[in-house]
Amino acid sequence: MIEQQKRKGPELPLVPVKRQRHELLLGAGSGPGAGQQQATPGALLQAGPPRCSSLQAPIMLLSGHEGEVYCCKFHPNGSTLASAGFDRLILLWNVYGDCDNYATLKGHSGAVMELHYNTDGSMLFSASTDKTVAVWDSETGERVKRLKGHTSFVNSCYPARRGPQLVCTGSDDGTVKLWDIRKKAAIQTFQNTYQVLAVTFNDTSDQIISGGIDNDIKVWDLRQNKLTYTMRGHADSVTGLSLSSEGSYLLSNAMDNTVRVWDVRPFAPKERCVKIFQGNVHNFEKNLLRCSWSPDGSKIAAGSADRFVYVWDTTSRRILYKLPGHAGSINEVAFHPDEPIIISASSDKRLYMGEIQ
């Protein structure tokens, strides 16, 4: 009955129209329901700039943390990464494919403030507000050592690049400590006046470099067991330190909204600050915003409270990238060891991994 009530339209001749190939390609990747269509490879190539990494997509979102994410580091082999923060958990992720969270390391009873792999990637070190530093086997995920001795929050840790496995730590108790993971207690302690927020070794691991709320960067000599020299220039707390891969220059991030490069070679001129970068900002949240070098030293990156990822050209000091996307303070940005990829950790509980040219 329904068929009979339909009015017939005018009889029009059907004329086939040959569509150009580029129209077919564009049509395959656009319009409603495009996701269900079998787009040809040509359509994907036309979607954006050429790809420059092995990531599944130019930007990958890693979500799984239940609180602010304070730190993130790529494994030295580049295939996995670790992240940690306020939820006291360390999450391990695959870099390629779907970026699965393949393991969760539990053991800290306070927020995890900083993470570092050792040089060969066999161990992962984590500093926590539970006053301890944990040493993890990165293959099995087991905690193999717990370093206890600080009397307040441990804000920073850094493993020696070579030699016996030493690690230095900095704490709110105002001390910088040196540990040999084969021993139970710290093997050296340096007393600073104020809270220590960031530490690293020099290239030969015979000096510890520290920064904190006294605005100064201090270099402690392990052989002579004393303060060797102090680098002044920042006008507010130093929240992040990073040594360049060849060991000649130190990067610092501070609450005076500057990122600085310092010459830490022996017998360098007295004025060791060689470059100042601006753009990133700190705010009332007072998060410990870190900083990092690209593997070849041509770029630097730093955390920022304005929700942007900042990447600078080291030579020209120009901002190469100011990347949006996060909804909270960016606490750390790290470079991939082999590919043009960066990862950012944010107070919005997320990590973004993306490729840069």
From Swiss-Prot:
Which terms in the Gene Ontology molecular function aspect does this entry carry?
RNA binding
List locations, semicolon-separated: Nucleus
User: How is this protein annotated for GO cellular component?
Assistant: catalytic step 2 spliceosome; cytosol; nuclear speck; nucleoplasm; nucleus; sno(s)RNA-containing ribonucleoprotein complex; U2-type catalytic step 2 spliceosome; U4/U6 x U5 tri-snRNP complex
Which keywords describe this protein according to UniProt? Isopeptide bond, Methylation, mRNA processing, mRNA splicing, Nucleus, Repeat, Spliceosome, Ubl conjugation, WD repeat
Report which superkingdom the organism of origin falls in.
Eukaryota
Answer whether the UniProt record assigns the keyword Repeat to this protein: yes
| Per UniProt, location of the Glycyl lysine isopeptide (Lys-Gly) (interchain with G-Cter in SUMO2) cross-link in this chain | 18, 270
Sites of Asymmetric dimethylarginine modification: 21
Q: Which SUPFAM superfamilies match?
A: WD40 repeat-like
Disulphide-bridged cysteine pairs: none
A GO term (biological process) for this protein? Answer: RNA splicing, via transesterification reactions
Q: Where are the WD repeats?
A: 64-103, 107-146, 149-189, 191-230, 233-272, 283-322, 325-357
The record describes its quaternary structure and partners as:
Component of the pre-catalytic and catalytic spliceosome complexes. Component of the postcatalytic spliceosome P complex. Part of the U5 snRNP complex. Interacts with PRPF8. Component of the U4/U6-U5 tri-snRNP complex composed of the U4, U6 and U5 snRNAs and at least PRPF3, PRPF4, PRPF6, PRPF8, PRPF31, SNRNP200, TXNL4A, WDR57, SNRNP40, DDX23, CD2BP2, PPIH, SNU13, EFTUD2, SART1 and USP39. Component of the minor spliceosome, which splices U12-type introns.
What is the role of this chain? Answer: Required for pre-mRNA splicing as component of the activated spliceosome. Component of the U5 small nuclear ribonucleoprotein (snRNP) complex and the U4/U6-U5 tri-snRNP complex, building blocks of the spliceosome. As a component of the minor spliceosome, involved in the splicing of U12-type introns in pre-mRNAs.
Q: What is this protein called?
A: U5 small nuclear ribonucleoprotein 40 kDa protein
Q: Which gene encodes it?
A: SNRNP40
